[in-house]
Curated annotation (Swiss-Prot):
Documented EC number(s): 2.3.1.274
Organism, as annotated: Mycoplasma genitalium (strain ATCC 33530 / DSM 19775 / NCTC 10195 / G37)
Function of the protein: Catalyzes the reversible formation of acyl-phosphate (acyl-PO(4)) from acyl-[acyl-carrier-protein] (acyl-ACP). This enzyme utilizes acyl-ACP as fatty acyl donor, but not acyl-CoA.
SUPFAM superfamilies linked: Isocitrate/Isopropylmalate dehydrogenase-like
Protein name (record): Phosphate acyltransferase
The organism's place on the tree of life at top rank: Bacteria
C-alpha cells in the first residue's frame, strides 16, 4: 500500500531542511511511499524539482514553542494544523511534527478524538538497553496527569503495539515507581497496579524503579507524562554527559582512545537518542508521531521509520479492535 505521510517542516529549533532532507533520503529507499511537506516559501526555497511522490503544501504561519493550545487554535493555516487536517480529512495516513509537544497533543486530540473512551493520549518512545534490546516508554510528555485506569489502558495499547511490530508474544510490562513494593506511590499507582495485575492477558511485572530501566527488565514501561518526561530527558542528558567526559579523556590519552574506539563508537551509536527518536501518539483514532523540538535529519529519519512500521502493522485498527472488549 502506498502510505501517505504529512510532515510539518516548521516550528522547531532547526532549519526546515533537516525535515526535508530526511524525507528525501527515506523516500530514496522506499519509493512506493508518498510524502506531503508542509512549510512556507522560505522553507521550500530552491526546492523546485521533487520526485512525483513528494509534494509541497504552503502554510502562512507556524506554531511557535511559546504558543499555547488556545493561541495555536487561532492559527488555522499553521503548518502543524494543515498537516493534522490532511490526516483528519483522509488525505494522509500519518502526521509527523517536531513542534510544541503541548500544542501537538492538544490539536491531534481535537482533530482525531480518543480511540476509546477510557484512553488519554500519550507519547510512546523507545529506549535502548544494555542487553541488545529496547523498551517502549509511555507517556513521555503528552499529558501530566493520568488516573490509574488511564495508565492501565496505556499498558493495553502498548502491549498491542509490541505484539504487532515485534516477535514478542508476551511483552513484559512495568509500572514506573519509586520502589518495587506494592504499597509504594500515589493512589493512581495503586489503582493501575491492581488493574494491570488482574488482567491475565498481560505479562505484568509490577513496579519498576528508574535505576533498573537500562537493564532491560521490561519491554514496556508505563508512567504519567510528567514522570516519564523527566526520566527520558535525564537519560538523554546522561548519555551526552558521558560522551563529553570520554571525549575529554581521550584528548588527554589518545592511545587509550585508539584501542577502545571501536567499542565506544558502537555504544555511542546504540545509546544516541538521535537514532532512537520519535514517539507514537497513542490513544487517538488516527496515527500521529512526534519528534524532538531540536530534531535534525537523523531524528526525523528515525521518526519516519517508526511511522512506517506503525502503518505497516495497521496499528490503529489493531488497537481499536482489541479495546472493543474494554468498553465498560
Amino acid at each position: 500500500m502506498a502510505f501517505r505521510f504529512a510532515v510539518d517542516c516548521l516550528g522547531f529549533e532547526n532549519k526546515p531542511s533537516e525535515a526535508i532532507e530526511a524525507v528525501l533520503k527515506y523516500w530514496s529507499f522506499h519509493q512506493d511511499l508518498n510524502f506531503i511537506l508542509i512549510g512556507d516559501e522560505k522553507a521550500f526555497d530552491g526546492l523546485d524539482i521533487l520526485p512525483k511522490n513528494i509534494t509541497k503544501k504552503l502554510a502562512n504561519s507556524f506554531i511557535e514553542m511559546t504558543d499555547t493550545p488556545l493561541s495555536a487554535r487561532r492559527k488555522v493555516n499553521s503548518s502543524m494544523q494543515i498537516a493534522i487536517n490532511l490526516v483528519r480529512e483522509g488525505n494522509a495516513d500519518v502526521v509527523i511534527s517536531a513542534g510544541s509537544s503541548a500544542v501537538y497533543a492538544s490539536l491531534t486530540n481535537d482533530a482525531f478524538g480518543k480511540i476509546n473512551k477510557n484512553t488519554k493520549s500519550a507519547f510512546m518512545s523507545y529506549v535502548p538497553t544494555d542487553n541488545n534490546n529496547w523498551f517502549y516508554f509511555l507517556d513521555v510528555g503528552a499529558n501530566k496527569y493520568f488516573t490509574g485506569k488511564e495508565l492501565y489502558f496505556l499498558g493495553l495499547m502498548a502491549d498491542i503495539f509490541v505484539k504487532k511490530t515485534t516477535t514478542k508474544k508476551t511483552p513484559k510490562i512495568g509500572l514506573l515507581n519509586i520502589g518495587t513494593e506494592e504499597n509504594k506511590g500515589f493512589d493512581y499507582h495503586q489503582e493501575a497496579f491492581k488493574l494491570l495485575k488482574a488482567d491475565k492477558n498481560l505479562n505484568f511485572l509490577g513496579f519498576v524503579e528508574s535505576r533498573f530501566l537500562l537493564d532491560g527488565i521490561c519491554d514496556i514501561l508505563i508512567a504519567d507524562g510528567y514522570s516519564g518526561n523527566l526520566v527520558l530527558k535525564a537519560m538523554e542528558g546522561t548519555f551526552k554527559t558521558i560522551a563529553r567526559i570520554l571525549k575529554r579523556g581521550y584528548k588527554r590519552n589518545p592511545l587509550a582512545g585508539l584501542f577502545s574506539l571501536g567499542i565506544i563508537k558502537s555504544v555511542a551509536k546504540k545509546f544516541d537518542y538521535k537514532n532512537n527518536a520519535g514517539a507514537v501518539v497513542m490513544g487517538l483514532n488516527k496515527l500521529a508521531l512526534k519528534t524532538h523540538g531540536s530534531a535534525d535529519k537523523q531524528q526525523f529519519l528515525s521518526t519516519i521509520r517508526l511511522a512506517h512500521l506503525s502503518l505497516k502493522s495497521d496499528l490503529i485498527n489493531a488497537i481499536k479492535t482489541s479495546l472493543n472488549n474494554y468498553e465498560e
